[in-house]
């Protein structure tokens, strides 16, 4: 019985796309804060000014803390989709930024998604990738973070009053922050087509589904058998072995 084959590159790209959002959000706020204060009445160097940036870290602590137990219950794919939704809502809320409270709450939401992505995505990519390619695939998340930071500085330049588009300072910063909603939407749409982690499927006793994912990713029945056996052994060791 044939199944529609999804390109491994597609899977790895969209699996790691959360890293781009992580990097973009990290870089874009430095440019946006030059103009946010004037519109919202935030004094430079004040507690309120610093907390706009720090609020993401507060959310990231929460996101990283809860993602592990949740991913073991709900699965990597489902939480990747939830993270994309949180990214999208946080990006739009930050870009609207009609008040200081809305901006901070939206940044906390972004932080939750950032923390979740930084803990979830490397694990997800490692569990999907063949053993001989795992190291290289694992670097994709970091590569995406760097790409996101680069794009953030490009957008900061283009959308600033003296930049390529020459937008008014009370308009440009909104767009700087809202642009993150585009890759967030792409992450959600692409994530719908991603497979579940075979390790998670094995943990849930869905051996046939796990084998099919490994077959799709590896295309080698011998390698599939080895990966499947390894996943089963790890599951038994973690959940059934009494030390």
Regions found by a protein language model. Give the residues of each.
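Transmembrane-helix signature of 12-pass secondary carriers
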Residues: 1-243
């Amino acid at each position: 019985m044939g199944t529609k084959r999804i390109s491994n590159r597609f899977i790895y790209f969209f699996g790691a796309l959360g890293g781009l959002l992580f990097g973009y959000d990290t870089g874009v706020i430095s440019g946006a804060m030059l103009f946010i204060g004037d519109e919202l009445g935030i004094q430079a160097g004040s507690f309120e000014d610093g907390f706009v940036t720090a609020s993401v870290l507060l959310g990231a602590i929460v996101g990283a803390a809860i993602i592990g137990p949740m991913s073991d219950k709900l699965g990597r794919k489902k939480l990747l989709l939830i993270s994309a939704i949180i990214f999208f809502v946080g990006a739009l809320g930050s870009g609207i930024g009609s008040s200081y409270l809305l901006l901070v709450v939206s940044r906390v939401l972004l932080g939750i998604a950032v923390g979740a992505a930084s803990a979830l995505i490397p694990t997800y990519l490692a569990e999907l990738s063949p053993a001989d390619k795992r190291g290289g695939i694992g670097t994709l998340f970091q590569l995406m973070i760097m790409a996101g930071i680069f794009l953030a500085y490009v957008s900061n330049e283009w959308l600033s009053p003296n930049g390529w588009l020459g937008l008014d300072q009370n308009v440009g910063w909104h767009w700087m922050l809202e642009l993150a909603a585009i890759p967030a939407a792409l992450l959600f749409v692409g994530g719908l087509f991603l497979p579940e982690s075979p390790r998670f499927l094995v943990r849930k006793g869905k051996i046939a589904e796990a084998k099919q994912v490994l077959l799709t990713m590896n295309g080698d029945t011998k390698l599939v058998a080895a990966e499947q056996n390894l996943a089963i052994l790890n599951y038994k060791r973690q959940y059934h072995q009494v030390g």
